[in-house]
From Swiss-Prot:
EC number: 3.5.4.16
Subunit structure: Toroid-shaped homodecamer, composed of two pentamers of five dimers.
Disulphide bridges, residue numbers: none
Gene: folE
Keywords, in A-Z order: GTP-binding, Hydrolase, Metal-binding, Nucleotide-binding, One-carbon metabolism, Zinc
NCBIfam families: folE (TIGR00063), PRK09347.1-2 (NF006825), PRK09347.1-3 (NF006826)
Entry-linked PROSITE patterns: GTP_CYCLOHYDROL_1_1
GO cellular component terms given for this protein: cytoplasm
UniProt-recorded name of the protein: GTP cyclohydrolase 1
Residues the record lists as binding Zn(2+): C75, H78, C146
Length: 184
């Protein structure tokens, strides 16, 4: 994969009229290929690998919230970055997930070519699958470079998406508790 990506970046540099052998660009295809491999490593990870058996038996049955998980992803339409934060809440049903695993779940799905709507859904379904929670709520807030750097060039715009599963969808009180908690 690395050599194919490297060649692709050399082609892009040439196509825009630059010299890939110019001093400042000489190692750029190699560096860009390495960066792209990292930014898309979510395709080569599984939920089982990243959660690594960090699901623990627990009597906890009240809402658990992990807030402000930073994320970096690539829009599938323009291959430009979007950055933001994710808030995840769930109601345990006999099992809790190790805290760092929430960030790993976010990263696994964010490190793919994505749209924010799908990313939010994938995170929620993964938390539900791993924990067996009676409810999951996920909110993602992000700024999209495809809207800020090109097109309409709106630098202050942001997008917010949410997915509510189980109790978070069925019970307005649960959903409102989640929304109030993330407001601080």
């Amino acid at each position: 994969m690395h050599n194919e990506l490297k060649q692709g970046y050399e082609n892009i540099i040439t196509a825009v009229g630059e010299d890939p052998n110019r001093e400042g660009l000489l190692d750029t295809p190699k560096r860009a290929a390495k960066a792209m491999e990292y930014l898309t490593q979510g395709y080569r990870q599984t939920l089982e690998e990243i959660t690594n058996n960090a699901v623990f038996t627990s009597d906890a049955d009240d809402m658990v919230l992990v807030q402000d998980i930073e994320l970096y992803s690539m829009c599938e339409h323009h291959l430009l970055p979007f950055t933001g934060r994710c808030h995840i809440a769930y109601i345990p049903n006999g099992k809790v997930l190790g805290l760092s695993k929430f960030a790993r779940i976010v990263d696994m799905f964010a490190r793919r070519f994505q749209i924010q709507e799908q990313l939010t859904h994938q995170i929620a379904k993964a938390v539900e699958e791993v924990t067996g929670a009676t409810g999951v709520g996920v909110i993602v807030e992000a700024k999209h470079m495809c809207m800020m750097m090109r097109g309409v060039e709106k630098q202050n715009s942001s997008m917010r998406t949410s997915v509510m599963l189980g109790n978070f969808r069925a019970d307005p009180k649960t959903r409102n508790e989640f929304l109030q908690l993330i407001k601080g």
